[in-house]
Curated annotation (Swiss-Prot):
Keywords: Oxidoreductase. It is an enzyme of class 1 (oxidoreductase). Its EC number is 1.2.7.3. GO terms for molecular function: 2-oxoglutarate synthase activity. The gene is korC. It comes from Methanothermobacter marburgensis (strain ATCC BAA-927 / DSM 2133 / JCM 14651 / NBRC 100331 / OCM 82 / Marburg) (Methanobacterium thermoautotrophicum). It catalyses: 2 oxidized [2Fe-2S]-[ferredoxin] + 2-oxoglutarate + CoA = succinyl-CoA + 2 reduced [2Fe-2S]-[ferredoxin] + CO2 + H(+). This is 2-oxoglutarate synthase subunit KorC. Heterotetramer of the KorA, KorB, KorC and KorD subunits.
Length: 186
């Protein structure tokens, strides 16, 4: 089993931390192999940001994501930039408040994409009180929608990765993201 995951958005959304959490969840807590890479523009906030994670039950011979099984798009620009790379039959998770969904309906149908809506920024604000944890809302949605890492592993990785004193809010955001999928944000 090899799963390629790309999480993309813009600087300031916590895309890189989301990738780190996912990689740690797989490798440290689920006993899988994982490689995480990242890229971002020169801007501190607002520029393009991308984290990629390869998860496998075997040693990973090539660490780059070429055709992701899972794409998490936290901005419309990220969606437009990376959606064509998504494997046919893959999984697409978007923040519907940040993308123009009617522009991708044909793509989703033609490529037989499993499509999930996770209004991460709004959910972070409404359920946790701060938008900065929108990335953990997306990790919760990703975990629930795909099962690529276990809930326990994701929670442990979050606790191990976020700044001290913010663990509870980040776990709340993670749970809120899971609930979005359980409640049928499809």
């Amino acid at each position: 089993m090899r799963k390629e995951i790309r999480i993309a958005g813009f600087g300031g959304q916590g895309v890189i931390l989301a990738g780190i959490v996912l990689g740690k969840a797989a490798s440290l807590y689920d006993g899988l192999y994982a490689v995480q890479t990242q890229s971002y523009g020169p801007e501190a906030r607002g520029g393009a940001s991308r984290a990629e994670v390869v998860i496998s039950d075997e040693e990973i011979d090539y660490p780059k994501v070429q055709s992701p099984d899972i794409l998490v798009a936290m901005s419309h620009q990220a969606l437009l930039t990376y959606m064509d790379d998504l494997k046919a039959g893959g999984t697409l998770i978007v923040d519907p408040d940040m993308v123009i969904e009617n522009e991708i309906q044909d793509f989703v149908e033609e490529r037989n994409i499993s499509y999930f809506r996770a209004p991460a920024t709004r959910t972070a604000e409404e359920k946790v009180g701060i938008t900065i944890v929108a990335n953990m809302v997306m990790i919760g949605a990703l975990t629930e929608a795909t099962g690529v890492v276990s809930v326990r592993a994701a929670e442990e990785a979050i606790k191990n990765s976020v700044p001290p004193g913010t663990e509870e809010k980040n776990i709340m955001a993670f749970q809120a993201g899971r609930e979005l999928i359980m409640e049928g944000q499809k």
